[in-house]
Amino acid sequence: MGLRREARELALQMLYAQDTLQGSLRDTLRGFREGVETGERTREFAEALVQGVMEHREAIDQAIVARSKNWALSRMPRVDLNIMRMAAYELMFKRDIPKKVSINEAIEIAKKYGDKESPAFVNGILDELEACPKDEERSDTE
């Protein structure tokens, strides 16, 4: 498994823990630093991804909801939602990562961690987000 895939999977675990436990982000990151053995570059990429998602969570969640026909965030499976948050962060705020790579990585992670409907659900919403004509959703700020 590649460094970035491993980092995205670690980031998913961090986001899920943050979403479920609702403690401070600092405590969540510290818990993973102390409790999960991984390479430094993997951990750094995962933490940067988590911090980016948390920093832009409101905009990311709004973008997901806008493309989720008849789905409120509260009804979405937590794993699927956090996979989409990671990919949406990359699609909206990271110009150095090709959009198709972000979507494909999210689908593969959904296959591994979600249920049998997860890959199609994640793909459908991310395809809508990727196809959005509003270029201002993809920021150069990071």
Curated annotation (Swiss-Prot):
Recite the UniProt keywords alphabetically: RNA-binding, Transcription, Transcription antitermination, Transcription regulation
Keyword GTP-binding present in the record's keywords: the answer is no
User: What InterPro entries does the annotation carry?
Assistant: NusB-like_sf (IPR035926), NusB_fam (IPR011605), NusB_RsmB_TIM44 (IPR006027)
SUPFAM superfamilies reported for this sequence: NusB-like (SSF48013)
Q: What Pfam family is a match, any one?
A: NusB
Using the record for this protein, list the coiled-coil segments as residue ranges, or answer none: none
Which GO terms label this protein's molecular function in UniProt? RNA binding
One Gene Ontology cellular component term attached to this UniProt record is: cytosol
Q: What top-level branch of life does the organism fall under?
A: Bacteria
Write out the GO biological process terms: DNA-templated transcription termination; transcription antitermination
Determine if Phosphoprotein is one of this entry's keywords.
no
Provide the family line: Belongs to the NusB family.
Q: What job does this protein perform?
A: Involved in transcription antitermination. Required for transcription of ribosomal RNA (rRNA) genes. Binds specifically to the boxA antiterminator sequence of the ribosomal RNA (rrn) operons.
What name does the UniProt record give this protein? Transcription antitermination protein NusB
